[in-house]
Amino acid sequence: MLIETVQLAVEENRHYTYPDIVVSCDPRDQHESRRLYHPLLIVEVLSPSTEAYDRGLKFNQYKKMPSLRHYLLVSQKTWLVEWYQLIEPGVWSHTALAEAADAVVIAELNLTLTLTQIYEDAGVAPMTAGFEAEEE
């Protein structure tokens, strides 16, 4: 797992991004210290300045990467994680997780994370019944 300072080669030698978290299990990436080519999981923490890009153009570029199976968008405003999973080539499911016990389960990584664990010590309040996302 690498965090934020690693380039992700979206289009080899043409376009690079800096995801907040990227995980690759591909042996071809094991000896890379600053650049990855075969992500399994990408996590982006949403901010007002990048949210539209993370949801739109960036995700469309990421979807073209054959190794990518999971894409997480993590809100900084409230407890909300949007989880995109590749079901079959070209088909992505979307799950919105908003309850403390809701969990991201990524079998390929033997990883289970509840929202409580994701937001522990983050200073972000759980979603309430009257929550409305702020307009950007």
For every predicted segment, state its role:
Residues 3-65, 73-136:
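C-terminal interaction segment
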